[in-house]
């Protein structure tokens, strides 16, 4: 009787201590692995049928394309549910961000974009995957997830010139993830 009661109390105490330790150190609701990561899925400007550079936008030259707002992940091709638009071709995605006032080193994970792109931060070409080309004749597919690092402060513009002529999907179908460089690299 008495030994069983003592054993029961010891098991309860160790269990409480163990679960408290798990709560503080391994709680999926407390320690969010994505803390510090911002998924960039909404408020993207999209220009269908045009590959626009930062300079084009500064000059107000959209090459005849009109701007519409899109949410990344809502559709999986350029048609954007418009029956009069093709699912393939090209388009430019633009996102304006307000970042920390002091210059900070950021990293952005760009998931696979179908099927080629050039990526600019403000006016600087940061990276490229495949070759969007100026037409479907000099386009080269290059589909892969990449991480790019850059420094920025305050107002920041992300721009992706994209083209797809060959895949089932087209354009940006998954949102990029942005955060301070150490946070993004630690997550991956």
Task: Describe every region a protein language model picked out.
Residues 39, 90-96, 103-107, 143-147, ...:
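Intrinsic-disorder/low-complexity, polar/charged segments enriched in Ser/Thr/Lys/Arg/Asp/Glu/Gln
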Residues 141-188:
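An acidic-aromatic loop/edge-strand motif
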């Amino acid at each position: 009787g008495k030994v069983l009661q003592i054993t029961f109390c010891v098991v309860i105490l160790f269990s409480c201590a163990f679960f408290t330790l798990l709560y503080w150190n391994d709680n999926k609701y407390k320690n969010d692995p994505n803390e510090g990561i911002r998924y960039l899925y909404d408020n993207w400007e999209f220009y269908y049928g045009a590959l626009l550079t930062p300079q084009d936008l500064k000059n107000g030259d959209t090459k005849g394309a009109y701007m519409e707002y899109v949410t990344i992940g809502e559709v999986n091709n350029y048609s954007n549910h418009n029956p009069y638009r093709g699912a393939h071709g090209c388009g430019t995605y633009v996102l304006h961000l307000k970042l920390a006032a002091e210059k900070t080193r950021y990293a952005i994970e760009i998931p696979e974009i179908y099927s080629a792109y050039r990526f600019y931060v403000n006016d600087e070409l940061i990276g490229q995957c495949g070759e969007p080309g100026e037409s479907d004749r000099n386009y080269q597919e290059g589909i892969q997830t990449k991480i790019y690092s850059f420094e920025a402060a305050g107002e920041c513009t992300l721009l992706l010139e994209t083209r797809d002529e060959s895949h089932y999907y087209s354009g940006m179908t998954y949102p990029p993830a942005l955060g301070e460089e150490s946070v993004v690299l630690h997550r991956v």
